[in-house]
Every structure is written in C-alpha cells, then in structure tokens.
Amino acid sequence: ETGITMQNIIKSIKEKKGTLLDVRSKIEFEENHIAGAINIPLDMVEVNIKNIETMPKPIVVYCLSGGRSGIATDILQQNGIEDVYNGGGIFSLNNFINNN
C-alpha cells in the first residue's frame, strides 16, 4: 500500500465512506458487533462476491481474532476486489476505532 494507513482507512469508515465487514457467525454477530458493521459469515463470503463488490470502499474485514478475516480478505482480493483490509479482531479494531 502506498502510504495508506489504518488511521486513514478508519477515518473513511467513520465518515460512512467505507464498509466494516464482520465475517464471524450470525450468532457471534448478534451477540456483539461494531456499530454499522455488515455480517457475512466467512463460509458465505465467496457466494456473496458480487454483493461485496458493490459495497463502499475501503472494506475493513474483521472477526474474533483476525484468522477468519485474513482468509476472507484473501478471498476478496483473489476475486479482484481492491481496497480490502484485514482489520483483525473485533476488540482490538473497536479500540482502534474509538481511539483514532
């Protein structure tokens, strides 16, 4: 990435110019999620490529610890979707959003 920092990406998200994509299960999402996030569980990412393609960029993908979001980010990038970032785990990402 050319000078794109997580701060800039989060700024876009806060300005409602991007998308927070939660790839945890529906149950996990219903228990708690970052405000404004969209839930598409990891096993549904591939079948939702066309839908995800139309979401506002940047897209920040997160899960519980960063594992599933890493896989989802790879899937999206391999399908030609640009401006997609692995935001890691929900708690660290939420802290980052609240502190930036």
Q: Predicted regions: what is each one?
A:
Residues T2-T19, K26-P58, G67-N100:
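Rhodanese-like catalytic fold shared by cysteine-dependent sulfurtransferases
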Residues Y62:
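Short, surface-exposed ligand- or partner-binding patches at beta-edge/loop junctions that are enriched
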